[in-house]
Regions:
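Non-heme di-metal
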Residues: 2-195
Length: 195
């Protein structure tokens, strides 16, 4: 049997010839392409594309390389800041009785986080040398980071408590517990998948 893929919606048909009509998007047989060999993706996201296409590219001037790197990194930092600020604004809106506004801020924050993730993915190890292209390496690294973040936040909470700053103490102490939970969850995943 021959495989035929609809170039409009991706439906795969097996038969001697393409179907007269795609059962999903209803285009004609002319929109089907015979699959030769293995299926391949026309495009996909790639980790560290900056290093692969810009960093050592002799056709790009040093000035443009610096500009591209600086802008990618600045955009990453900006997107991360927006995530925190938008979630803060969502909390304010909810407290003021504007739940729809709060929910939109939360949606926008998630989109900004997606943007930050894409900038991080493009920059790869040029953004953070410990970040790698493999799940195992990233789990190992982040387990250590979460345990460190737990200790750092706990120390800040203790200092706030010593100075009778209850609002700061309570919030940061709860965050320390969140970091501990993250660390334990990531450690469990590391052990489950990578022994």
């Amino acid at each position: 049997m021959t495989k035929w893929v609809c170039t409009v919606c991706g439906y795969v048909y097996e038969g001697d010839a393409a179907p007269a009509e795609c059962p999903v998007c209803h285009v004609g047989a002319d929109k089907f392409k015979k699959v030769e060999g293995d299926l391949t993706l026309a495009a996909e996201h790639e980790y560290g594309v900056y290093a692969k296409t810009v960093k050592n590219n002799p056709e790009i001037s040093d000035e443009d390389k610096k500009y591209i790197f600086d802008q990618l990194k600045a955009n990453f930092v900006g997107e991360c800041s927006e995530v925190g600020m938008y979630l803060c604004m969502a909390r304010i809106a909810h407290r003021e009785g504007y739940p729809e506004v709060g929910l939109y801020w939360e949606k926008a924050a998630y989109e900004e986080a997606e943007h930050a993730a894409k900038f991080a993915e493009m920059l790869g190890e040029d953004l953070e040398p410990n970040m790698k292209a493999t799940t195992k390496d990233n789990l190992k690294w982040r387990v250590d980071c979460e345990f460190g973040a737990t200790a750092g936040k706990f120390d800040l909470a203790k200092c706030a408590k010593k100075n009778n700053l209850d609002a700061i103490h309570d919030t940061v102490h709860e965050m320390a517990r969140d970091e501990a939970r993250h660390g334990k969850a990531l450690q469990g995943l590391l052990e489950r998948y990578f022994g």
